[in-house]
Amino acid sequence: MTSQKKAPIIIGVTGGSGSGKTTVSQAIAQKFANHSVMLLPQDAYYKHQDGSFEERQETNYDHPDAFDTDLLIEQATMLKNHQPIEQPVYDYKIHNRTDEVVHVEPQDVIILEGILVLADARLRDLMDIKVYVDTDDDIRLLRRMSRDMESRGRSFDDIVMQYLKTVKPMFHEFIEPTKRYADLIVPEGGNNRVAIDLLVTKIQSILNMND
């Protein structure tokens, strides 16, 4: 009689824009080279928009309504049940979802990363570990400026305007309050090696139980 295959581990990693979520996620993935690991970015699940480019520029991308959370929950559940998904693709330069999808197979460890992954109880219930990356506001702003200017083709003035208009207020209204749901709060992001090691130890213990 064969034993039932264990469900993949889902780790939720959240924090404000520029907090170091991706760095933490990559640090986790590097520690588990002997296991299959995948990143499931919440950004891929921004809703499709029919408006003009100018209208899409004005969208509040830090509000929960900007995301197709139902689709994210559906596909995260499928991965948890060992089913492949067709993940949407989001293009930051056009501020919209593309017509493309990416075929994704379930892996041993699924890192679900995004600014609002802890905001919905249905999504939290799928997670084995919930992590909040806590970084100073000024540092996050500087990181966001560097990233958006270099890789997303945005201007300095545009970044500052968006930060003051939506990013900062939405962080305090929606993102920071989800800290209370975290199993682990990681100050200083990926630079906090002690927190990363503690997280890796916990993940490894769950994997060992699943073997």
UniProtKB/Swiss-Prot annotation:
**NCBIfam families (UniProt xref):** PRK05480.1 (NF004018), udk (TIGR00235)
Q: What class of enzyme is it?
A: transferase
User: Which reaction(s) are listed as its catalytic activity?
Assistant: uridine + ATP = UMP + ADP + H(+); cytidine + ATP = CMP + ADP + H(+)
Which compartment or compartments is the protein found in? Cytoplasm
User: Which family is it part of?
Assistant: Belongs to the uridine kinase family.
The record's listing under PANTHER family reads:
URIDINE KINASE
The protein in question is named Uridine kinase
Query: Where do the annotations place ATP binding?
Result: G15, G16, S17, G18, S19, G20, K21, T22
Transferase in keyword set: yes
Q: Mind naming one GO cellular-component term on file for this protein?
A: cytoplasm
Keyword match Magnesium: no
The protein's matches in Gene3D superfamilies, at most eight in alphabetical order, are given as: P-loop containing nucleotide triphosphate hydrolases
Q: Which gene encodes it?
A: udk
